[in-house]
Amino acid sequence: MQGNAVFVSVVLVGCIAHAAKAQDVLELPNLTLPQPNAYAPATNPNASQNAFSPTVTLNAALTEDSEPVNGGLIWRVFGTSPAADGKLPLIATAQGGSTALQLTPGSYFVHTTFGRASASTRIDVGSEPLTQTVVLNAGGLRLDAMLPDGSNVRREQLIFDIYEALVDETSGERTLILPNVPAGQIVRLPEGTYHVVSRYGAINAEIRADLRVQAGKTTDAAIEHRAAQVTLNLVREEGGFPLPDTAWSVLDASTGNIINENIGAFPSMVLAAGEYTAVARHRDRLFRREFVVSAGRDVTVRIQTDEHEVDSENAR
């Protein structure tokens, strides 16, 4: 059972630079590059060989008219002629914000990454100091979710997957960019539209939305989930203590398909709004009860052994 309504509240705010994680690095698609095992601040193996190497200052900005990014950047400088293995030689690396390198005169490829955004440019170093600014044309996306009444969801059960917006013509699927993004984390992305899948809990509360990221801005998007938390109890009488060692199955009432199975006295789960059937097995006895999940209204479903017992043929 899946909610069909999609409500997305989007707010654009000024983009603030935060440190990017190492796993956010993307490779240049059209170049064969080596993969360094570690990054050292402003290292250049050629600098010590030439005391007259000019200083090259590298800056990165989200847009052409924005201030330089002050953190979270990864810089790699490559030579322009492939080595014997077909890869471009790595000349220097650096992390952080703007960086200053000493490079011998010549041509270089500069590759910059900031989260999932990246850019590359070619520079020509002469005998004089050089300052180069790379424009990333990137922004940020910060995801969250809420219930229909505006209250917060349980963030520890909320996760997002970010996909490319366009469907691949060959596979018929979208390309996954970043899985399992937690709520509240800013993801750095190139400007563009992205397809976001929000999953609340691990069963069937899933909402999709297309969101636009603008360069130089952080897009704050809150997706509305029509779901609630459900706790199951099997009791001998009203007000009784839940029976342990109970095996549970939860069925979609409209299809009869099992959507969750669990064992315990009071299993808890998040379900999309809709109609369901709970089946409990305890010591070879079966019990069954229908229940309804309303968006944003957590509920405890109690099955009494003296009212809801069924034979095995009527359990589903």
PLM features: what roles do these ranges have?
Residues Q23-P45, Q95, F114-N137, G201-E224, ...:
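Structured interaction patches on ligand/partner-binding surfaces of diverse proteins
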Residues E64-A84, P148-G172, E237-N257:
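Short, ordered, surface-exposed loop/turn motifs in non-cytosolic proteins
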Residues H18-A22:
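Sec/Tat signal peptide C-region and signal peptidase I cleavage site
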Residues V8-C15:
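Bacterial N-terminal signal peptides
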Residues T80-G97, V167-A183, D252-A265:
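Short, acidic Ser/Thr/Gly-rich low-complexity loop/linker segments typical of extracellular
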Residues P54-E64, L141-D149, Q229-E238:
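A short, amphipathic beta-strand motif
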Residues M1-V8:
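Bacterial N-terminal signal peptides that target proteins for export
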Residues Q95-S107, F114-R116, N180-I203, F266-T277, ...:
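Short Pro-Gly-centered beta-turn/loop motif in secreted/extracellular proteins
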